[in-house]
Regions:
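Disordered, acidic Ser/Thr/Pro-rich linker "stalks" and the adjacent N-terminal cap
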Residues: 395-399, 562, 628-662, 673-753, ...
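Aromatic-lined ligand-binding clefts that engage carbohydrates, nucleic acids, or primary amines
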Residues: 426-440, 469, 539-562, 569-570, ...
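Aromatic-lined substrate-binding rim segments of carbohydrate-active enzymes
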Residues: 72-138, 210-215
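Short beta-strand-plus-loop segments that form exposed binding edges in beta-rich domains
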Residues: 471-476, 594-600, 668-675, 761
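Aromatic- and acidic-residue-enriched segments that line the glycan-binding/catalytic groove
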Residues: 101-107, 120, 131-155, 206, ...
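N-terminal carbohydrate-binding accessory modules
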Residues: 31-86
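Catalytic-core region of carbohydrate-active enzymes that cleave or remodel glycosidic bonds
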Residues: 215, 246-339, 343, 350, ...
Length: 785
């Protein structure tokens, strides 16, 4: 229509207004095949360009699956009010494809709606579709059913894996492709894979994933992300590179520039805090350092994404596990600027004030939306119970016990049952346990098999007659990072009694899904104190609101409120509460169901106005870490290497003059770069005879002379979890023991080692090791003090 040819000016205005409205409408939502493009986004020589103008991406990560759908708009409004102009979002493949070929894009999995709300709230979107995500999510978002192929190689060009990936990403393109900026939507970039440099070096695999996204209809700029030291592994030179780090942007961007001389600088994961794992201290970020590094990036025209801007909660059974085995809490608060419950923290307002100094032309910051109502309620008793052993399905008969995947089960628990003969006290041993095995004789618990310590055997008491042996296996989420991701769950055969293989098993599937919960037979009879059981109760509310369920009187398990699984709990902490969103509660009668595998002190529950995220109770743990006070007898004949590390934060690779063979590896710190009495290690990898990193599967910390657990999580296990943003740190809170410091790893089996990689602490410099000695030996020789 030529406006100039219309004689009636009012009509011309009406037609022009309608035409502009058509251009700015997201027609893809209404089913129109091609939506008009109203904006452009490109990657320039120095800057990101939005409609041809410099655009500094101020992004923050929020995962739709970790926020109730009813609260998506509120959290996105909070992100906008903090000063973000973009939100970054992972997709979790296993959430969207729970069974092969069955896709879910509704409810909590409606990521398209999340993106549409982001657009309505004035936010752009960076999409991270996978297929691998990490994110402390079950198996890094990879579907468990792939593990039904015993020999499948994940994150490789294995045809079975790639076929499944291509099917999934095609669905992602169908669902989210119309929401790209090139089609009138908010998605400005899409990520190829995720931190692949930590995992492999196959550029062919990365090319396959890139081409699959292109074939799925993604036509926005694609990019990949890695920490700078891993970036060149599998790096595609025709893809934009973004760096992940938690501190020191100047140094890390300098590393990025060596690999990518041109283009804007971007930190794709910048950490304001960290996630929590069961049994370790709650993490708090260094806010002053966070703000200082953030301002450096703002002042130097660098873009960034705060991971996490809002962490939320890993509801359901979706929480993952750090390597080699450190299960994550359901709370994903992350010490983020927006708290788990969506509150504006002091860090939120400090971040907002900082962003206000660097707004782009025409930008203003809206006021934060009001917080959701908070309620508390008095303790109520759960008066009904359903013992696990009295609510079993039909058994599967098998000669030897298999893992859960063998029986087509992905989540929940599994009970393995057999008969054993009368006899004297004797040893029960399994090949491995994934993850916790509660062992019962005739219904009475006699011990726990514990993957954390590689405890795969225990002493059974004397039996005057043949007895029923039950092993109730509880998985805690599959490993979500590193080569240990193919984390099959359950009892790993063979199972031996006094060295003889036990045969003839009944296997009971306990998936903890809606169907199973609906079939439970509750009674008013209380079970034995430590028998595994479901508990049920109701409580009345005058009005709904967010609350935190106090679980300090309970043991270990999972809980549901009005049919919604709130996640896992464990009395050892640090989390002692479960976030119950008000949108899942209602005025009047509410129902709660709690599975307790250990047995509660009292079957009562109360609602609190504030969470408890930082209360460790190690005395309640059924396993005490094996780090006894001792003096080491390190024989010089066991020494594989000695030398000095270079100062700074760069990864350093040490090659032994001669490969050494043993089951134990010891790194001894003789002094520190800064002369202080501390030692710290961000990450240790051991190298095989071919110079490749040895899998951490089965590794445990055999001994550490000192670790800080009061003021921060400086646990020794941090040195082998694959994460360079956290670290082992010797004690500094209530004491500061001096050098030498020793960390000994039990590798689970004898290995031939040709060297090791050492990653120094990446943030402040305290504890960076200067002079060291490395030992490899077959027997741990400790002399008790």
């Amino acid at each position: 229509v030529k406006i100039s040819t219309i004689s009636n000016p009012r009509l011309a205005v009406v037609i022009l207004t309608a035409f502009v409205a058509f251009l700015t409408t997201d027609h893809s939502r209404a089913g129109v095949g091609v939506a008009a493009t109203t904006h452009t986004f490109t990657i320039g020589t120095n800057d990101f360009l939005l409609d041809g103008n410099r655009f500094q991406i101020r992004c923050g990560e929020i995962h739709a699956a970790r926020v109730p759908k009813e609260y998506w708009r509120h959290r996105l409004q909070m992100a906008k009010a903090m000063g973000l102009n973009t939100v970054c979002a992972y997709l979790f493949w296993n959430l969207h494809e729970p069974k092969p070929g069955e896709f879910v894009w509704t409810g909590q999995a409606d990521d398209a709606e999340f993106c549409r709300i982001a657009k309505e709230e004035g936010l752009w979107v960076i999409l991270r579709p996978g297929p691998y995500a990490c994110a402390e999510w079950e198996m890094g978002g990879t579907p468990w059913w792939l593990l039904k192929h015993d020999d499948i190689q994940l994150r490789t060009r294995d045809p079975r894996y790639l076929k499944a990936v291509k099917s999934y990403l095609k669905e992602v393109g169908r669902e989210l492709g119309p929401l790209q900026i090139t089609h009138g939507g908010p998605i400005i970039m899409a990520q190829v894979e995720n931190e692949y440099g930590f995992f492999g070096k196959d550029t062919g695999y990365m090319t396959d994933i890139k081409n699959t996204l292109l074939d799925a209809g993604f036509d926005v700029p694609l990019f990949e992300c890695n920490p700078p030291d891993q970036m060149q592994n599998g790096m595609l030179t025709n893809l934009f590179q973004a760096a992940n780090f938690g501190s020191d942007p100047e140094h890390n961007f300098a590393k990025l520039r060596k690999l990518q001389p041109a283009g804007p600088l971007m930190c794709s994961e910048f950490y304001p805090g960290w996630f929590d794992t069961w049994g370790q201290p709650h993490h708090l970020g260094n806010t002053a350092k966070y703000l200082s590094d953030l301002e450096y990036m703002l002042a130097h025209d660098a873009s960034f994404s705060i991971y996490m801007a809002h962490g939320g909660t890993t509801f359901g059974l979706w929480s993952g596990c750090d390597r080699p085995f450190k299960p994550d809490t359901s709370s994903y608060d992350y010490d983020a600027p927006i708290s788990e419950a969506g509150w504006a923290t002091p860090k939120f307002f400090q971040t907002r004030a900082l962003f206000a100094k660097y707004l782009l032309p025409g930008e203003t910051l809206p006021a934060p939306p009001p917080p959701n109502p908070i309620i508390a309620f008095a303790p109520v008793e759960l008066t009904e119970s359903a013992p696990v052993f009295e609510n079993l399905p039909t058994a599967i008969k098998d000669s030897l016990p298999g893992n859960m995947e063998t029986y087509d089960q992905g989540y929940g628990c599994m009970l393995y049952r057999t008969k054993i003969p009368a006899g004297a006290a004797t040893t029960l041993q399994v090949a491995a346990i994934h993850d916790f095995g509660y062992v019962y004789l005739n219904g009475k618990r006699v011990g726990v098999l514990d993957r954390r310590s590689a405890t795969a055997k225990l002493l059974l008491p004397e039996r005057a007659a043949p007895a029923r042996l039950d092993i109730l296996v509880e998985p805690m989420g599959r490993v979500n990072f590193g080569p240990e991701m193919a984390d099959r769950k359950g009892l790993i055969a063979p199972v031996k009694l006094n060295g003889e293989v036990l045969k003839g098993w009944d296997i009971f599937k306990l998936p903890l899904d809606d169907k199973m919960l609906a079939g439970l037979k509750f009674t008013g009879v209380k079970p034995d104190t430590n028998a595994p059981a479901f508990w049920r109760g109701t409580f009345q509310l005058e009005h709904a609101g967010d609350t935190f369920l106090d679980l300090r009187g309970w043991g270990k398990g999972d809980l549901w409120i009005n049919g919604h699984c709130l996640g896992r709990y464990w009395n050892i902490g640090p989390s002692q509460t479960a976030f119950a969103p008000g949108c899942w509660l209602h005025r009047g009668l509410n129902q709660i169901v709690i599975l307790d595998l250990l047995g509660p002190q009292q079957p009562k529950i109360a609602g609190m106005e504030k969470p408890i995220l930082d209360q460790l109770r190690p005395a309640l743990d059924f396993h005490v870490q094996n780090h006894p006070p001792a003096k080491l007898n390190l024989d010089s004949s066991m020494m594989a290497d000695s030398g000095s590390f270079a100062p700074g934060t760069d990864t350093q690779e040490i090659k032994f003059a001669t490969p050494a063979t043993g089951k134990y590896f010891c790194l001894e710190s003789l002094n520190a770069q800064d002369g202080q009495p501390y030692a710290a290690v961000a990450e240790l990898d051991l190298l095989d005879v071919n110079g490749q990193a040895i899998s951490h599967d089965g590794w445990t910390v055999a001994y550490v002379d000192s670790e800080e657990l009061e003021k921060e999580d400086g646990s020794a296990a941090n040195a082998i979890d694959g994460q360079t943003a956290n670290y082992w740190h010797t004690q500094w809170g209530s004491a500061s023991p001096g050098h030498p410091h020793q960390l000994i790893l039990n590798l689970g089996k004898t290995q031939t080692i040709s060297g090791f990689r050492y990653v120094p602490r990446q943030s402040e410099g305290a504890g960076r090791i200067k002079d060291y000695r490395a030992f490899v030996f077959t027997k741990l020789d400790l002399l008790t003090k």
